[in-house]
């Protein structure tokens, strides 16, 4: 059985190898679709109060602040959530969804930035009413928190816009390709599992590549040193819209072979989850949910219906 090949590159090594294209790549963000990262967010979508959602809030639930929905959020990278050009206002899909959910409950929105590792404590301590920050539903997390699902957890294969590759959606499609992925992630586990299956069936192994810098990774793809990048779909969709130099050729559930969903987290048994689920389903029915997704180029990750405490990924 031929062993899998894998390569790890540091930023300096790759930059020196492909410096000839760096100057051109630095202006790519101006060539594609510019998403709004201003603090003003003039095109942010707003909605009216949803009586059904308001009624679904348990009488026992106490909000952190009167007339306000306080949401914990971890600003990372666009389009999910990031800081605006003023370096202090949180913008992105999660912020927009939090806004329309707050609107539907007839409340003002307050976003509280939290470190990723601290979101459970922020909820348990009562610092926030809910957390909306790309949290995947797992059976282990459901022991402590309630969830209202709002988006598919997807990872995606992206290639150069002029690549001859049309589709990468199943194990045999990646055989023999040079694919960049992220070490220690679900997407790496998926890619390695697919590669193992391919080798067992006599197909060519994947040449797995790892980079310690996203910009360098993108440069490697544009230079033809890799055939595809397999990473978080949302962030790659944003880059594709901004730069116009890559395109999607396949998505896979982040929990493959199971389906994984992202959800708003609330304290277990607090009485807020059903109201959030009602709000989300009414936003889906009205088309507002789709508009919010499309504003951040995330339409491919839509769900048909929100659920309270949907099946989560099993504890490993």
Task: Name the predicted role of every residue range.
Residues 100-104, 112-113, 117-130, 144-145, ...:
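Short helices/loops that flank or line small-molecule/ion binding pockets
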Residues 152-159, 241-281, 298-316:
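Periplasmic-binding protein-like
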Residues 161-179:
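Flexible hinge/capping segments at coil-to-helix
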Residues 72-77, 112-117, 126, 130-138, ...:
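Beta->alpha turn/N-cap motifs
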Residues 34-134, 295:
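Extracytoplasmic small-molecule ligand-binding "clamshell" domains
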Residues 117-121, 135-142, 190-199, 222-258, ...:
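A ligand-binding cleft/hinge motif common to bilobed small-molecule-binding domains
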């Amino acid at each position: 059985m031929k062993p899998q090949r894998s390569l790890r590159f540091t930023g300096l090594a790759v930059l020196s190898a492909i410096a000839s294209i760096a100057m051109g790549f630095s202006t790519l963000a101006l060539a594609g679709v510019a998403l709004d990262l201003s603090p003003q967010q003039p095109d942010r979508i707003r909605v009216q109060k949803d009586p059904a959602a308001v009624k679904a809030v348990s009488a026992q639930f106490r909000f952190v602040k009167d007339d306000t929905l306080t949401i914990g959020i971890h600003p990372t990278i666009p389009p999910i959530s990031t800081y605006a050009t003023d370096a202090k206002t949180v913008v992105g899909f999660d912020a927009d969804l939090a806004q329309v959910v707050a609107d539907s409950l007839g409340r003002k929105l307050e976003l509280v930035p939290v470190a990723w590792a601290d979101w459970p404590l922020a909820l348990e301590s009562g610092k926030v009413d809910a957390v909306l920050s790309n949290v995947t539903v797992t059976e282990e997390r459901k022991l402590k928190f309630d969830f209202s699902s709002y988006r598919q957890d997807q990872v995606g294969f992206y290639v150069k816009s002029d690549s001859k590759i049309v589709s990468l959606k199943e194990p045999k499609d990646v055989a023999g390709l040079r694919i960049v992925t992220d070490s220690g992630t679900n997407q790496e586990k998926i890619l390695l599992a697919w590669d193992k299956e391919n080798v067992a069936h006599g197909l060519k192994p994947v040449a797995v590549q790892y980079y310690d810098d996203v910009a360098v990774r993108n440069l490697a793809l544009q230079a033809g040193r890799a055939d595809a990048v397999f990473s978080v779909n949302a962030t790659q969709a944003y880059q594709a819209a901004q730069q116009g130099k890559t395109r999607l050729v396949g998505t896979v559930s982040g929990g493959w072979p199971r389906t994984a969903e992202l959800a708003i987290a609330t304290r277990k048994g607090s009485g807020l989850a059903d109201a959030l689920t009602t709000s989300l389903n009414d936003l889906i029915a009205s088309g507002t949910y789709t508009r919010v997704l499309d504003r951040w180029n995330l339409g491919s990750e839509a769900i048909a219906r929100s659920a309270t405490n949907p099946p989560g990924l099993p504890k490993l």
